[in-house]
């Protein structure tokens, strides 16, 4: 049982997301457990941040959307870390849009 838990944790640790925001571009790069990498690019000026919250569970999902394209981020984070990321990213996106 411990081996199975360790193996599942090891596999999930290989999953990564990288979110890069500049004045010119927002890039989301997701590496899945299988090793497959998916990238999405957005114009930050047309991008909206969608944060779903539950009164007791906190932030349940974060999505970035622009022109009909929607990408979820941070699914693997706990609700507290999701809230922290959503706040920091929302502030960074607002700063880029003002510049």
What are the roles of these predicted feature ranges?
Residues 18, 27, 48, 61-63:
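Beta-strand secondary-structure signal
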Residues 24, 45-47, 69:
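Short beta-strand or tight-loop elements
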Residues 1-15:
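Alpha-helical transmembrane spans
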Residues 21-24, 56-60:
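A short, compositionally biased
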Residues 59-99:
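A membrane-cytosol interface segment of integral membrane proteins
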Residues 37-59:
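Pleckstrin homology
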Residues 13-39:
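Membrane-cytosol interface motif
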